[in-house]
A protein has these predicted regions:
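Gly/Ala-rich beta-loop-alpha elbow adjacent to hydrolase catalytic centers
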Residues: 144-148, 152
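Serine hydrolase/lipase
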Residues: 62, 66-69, 129-141, 157-321
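A conserved cap/lid and substrate-binding interface adjacent to the catalytic center
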Residues: 2, 9, 18-143, 162-169, ...
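Substrate-binding/charge-relay-adjacent region of secreted/lumenal peptidase catalytic domains
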Residues: 14
Length: 321
């Protein structure tokens, strides 16, 4: 019996990457019944590296240069239950990528001075660039789980400055954070779109905690990190997000942490502030607009500092008690 993922729109989209019928012209639907679009490009082990990347568009008959939005799915590791049917995929994913990358991340205590990726990550990056070239005017939405999360992180980090601006949003789940094995140039690229990348990790899933420090949270990580407040499942189900639960607002329930929730909120507000500043600057600032921007920036910073202080006091009190 197939279990249900929690009914979060973006998680549901991400997990369509495991659809057994995923192939060219396949109509992609989430488990909850929402239609995402049609697969128009497939990159399945094109160079023997094991990558599986899919481009999905709403109208496959539309001219490529007219397409406004493309969903890119990076498939995660082939599960142990498929070892006999997909032995080559299983070996590629687990032995030549998951294990290798995990080892490199754990040995790399500080950010690297060079790219320490694998061939699958590089093949995935080529696939994303190819998709973006085919659809030159489209905004790109990126999704990935497990190894697919790492493929997605690396692919975005490998884009050029003019290309990365087209990433509209990215939602990645239960994969190691590869920030510390990226080159300095690649880290700058993902940092430039940090608030567009939503990086979910389950503290009860050992795989998704590789390369992470719960105290640092989103600091020194790819994107905004969210630690999921999950229920306990067996090893496989925990990793496959079946421990995820929704809060009262219908969003994935996350753990509160100064360096995640408050820091993430600060970054998002500052991102909105920057967009507002750019819009107002088009005609030059009036004195009133400059005063408004200064007070807005100060207000965001003050509110975040206050929340961090309150959170810090609560943590100290809980430790003392």
């Amino acid at each position: 019996m197939i279990k249900d993922y929690v009914n979060d729109k973006n998680l549901q989209i991400a997990m369509t990457e495991y659809d057994s019928e995923m192939d060219l012209d396949h109509v992609v639907k989430t488990q909850s019944g929402d239609q995402i679009g049609t697969v128009t490009q497939v990159y399945n082990n094109t160079t023997g590296a094991g990558e599986q990347v899919y481009a999905v568009v709403k109208n496959p008959n539309e001219k490529a240069d007219k397409v406004q939005e493309v969903t890119v799915l990076f498939r995660g590791s082939t599960g142990p239950d498929h070892f006999w049917e997909e032995t080559a995929d299983f070996w590629n994913d687990w032995a030549e990528n998951d294990a290798v990358i995990a080892k490199r991340i754990m040995l790399q205590k500080d950010p690297s001075y060079q790219d320490k990726s694998t061939e699958q990550l590089k093949a995935s990056a080529r696939a994303l660039k190819d998709i973006m070239e085919k659809y030159p005017n489209a905004k790109i939405n990126v999704y990935g789980h497990s190894l697919g999360s790492m493929d997605a992180q690396y692919s975005m980090a490998s884009l050029q400055t003019d290309q990365v601006k087209r990433i509209q949003q990215a939602y990645i789940y239960n994969g190691p954070d590869i920030y510390r094995i990226l080159s300095p140039e690649q880290r700058k690229v993902v940092d430039s779109i940090k608030t567009r990348i939503h990086n979910y990790a389950d503290p009860d899933d050992p795989i998704s905690m590789v390369g992470r420090d719960m105290v640092k949270g989103s600091i020194g990580s790819v994107g905004l990190v969210y630690y999921v407040d999950s229920t306990k499942e067996d090893f496989v189900n925990q990793h496959m997000t079946y421990g995820y639960q929704l809060d009262k607002n219908g969003k994935i329930k996350i753990l509160s942490n100064t360096s995640t929730v408050i820091y993430n909120d600060y970054l998002l507000q500052m991102d909105n502030y920057t967009l507002l500043k750019e819009k107002l600057s088009e005609g030059g600032y009036t004195k009133e607009e400059q005063l408004f921007l200064d007070s807005e920036q100060a207000g965001i910073a003050a509110a975040s500092i206050s929340l961090m202080s309150t959170e810090g006091k609560s943590i100290i009190k809980s430790i003392r008690d």
